């Protein structure tokens, strides 16, 4: 469609005719809130790699997280020394502190304290936190005291993003004994993505993006990908040099029941399906094709007595009508009623 904006013609078909994913589905449900596997399909050919690579970079480098930025140890003037009664040297203790994962609910720097006076292993859980900071990996080893030694650690926590070297922290005190730390703020520990073929109707030359995200527990994988997508959207929107709202208004209301694939209005009984598949759909209260295509494959497989064989059978029948699972049909009930009314008028 060509839309006039000022003295320019905007061709909305440049984006309106591209295949777009209807939703992101979580492929792996787990009690582990630090891992998520997500599937995004269908995408235009090549878009899986484009989007996957962009999401991976932003996930790893651009999300806010908390980390220690400095430590002061009683009686220690620099990190290249040892502490009597402590098995590890200060350098090793500093390395262990960098492995502590934190969650913080304020943007203001926070100061924590660790006080020890008895022999034995000291863990991250021994750090005294306040109401704004929480240690996520309490079992992280910090050091081992070989005898009863009294030590006090003063720790500064900040919010930030990405990786910041020790000499790049702003506003740290230059007092003797304060050891600046390299800080890895990113709450995302690892990201992996793969691209597979996706099917739309009879066509299989589309992309399926599978994105795996591991976090430190301070943020859920779902929120991590949502924030990353928002960052990318905000960064690239500056390239759009026309008013998107006008094209949306021009297209508003143009869609009606006559524009929709009328196979959506067919009853399940009209499809050439096995008795088993038909009964499974009816038991799930699915009576129309339009209701069926809005279900994801994962949702269907959770239906009682519904297996992979029935799924493949239904997918084949839907494909013959240029339909598939996971489709988004806005206002289906209204469109169905319009179609039904028009059909009754034609038959009268």
From Swiss-Prot:
Q: Which domain of life is it from?
A: Bacteria
Q: Which Gene3D superfamilies would you find in this protein's record?
A: 5' to 3' exonuclease, C-terminal subdomain, DNA-directed RNA polymerase, insert domain, RNA polymerase, RBP11-like subunit
One GO cellular component assignment for this chain's record is: DNA-directed RNA polymerase complex
Q: Which reaction does it catalyse?
A: RNA(n) + a ribonucleoside 5'-triphosphate = RNA(n+1) + diphosphate
Name the segments for region: Alpha N-terminal domain (alpha-NTD): 1-243
Kindly report, in one word, the top-level EC class recorded for this enzyme.
Answer: transferase
Q: Which GO terms describe its molecular function?
A: DNA binding; DNA-directed RNA polymerase activity; protein dimerization activity
Q: What is its EC number?
A: 2.7.7.6
Q: Please give the subunit comment from the record.
A: Homodimer. The RNAP catalytic core consists of 2 alpha, 1 beta, 1 beta' and 1 omega subunit. When a sigma factor is associated with the core the holoenzyme is formed, which can initiate transcription.
Task: Give the domain section of the comments.
Answer: The N-terminal domain is essential for RNAP assembly and basal transcription, whereas the C-terminal domain is involved in interaction with transcriptional regulators and with upstream promoter elements.
Protein name as catalogued: DNA-directed RNA polymerase subunit alpha
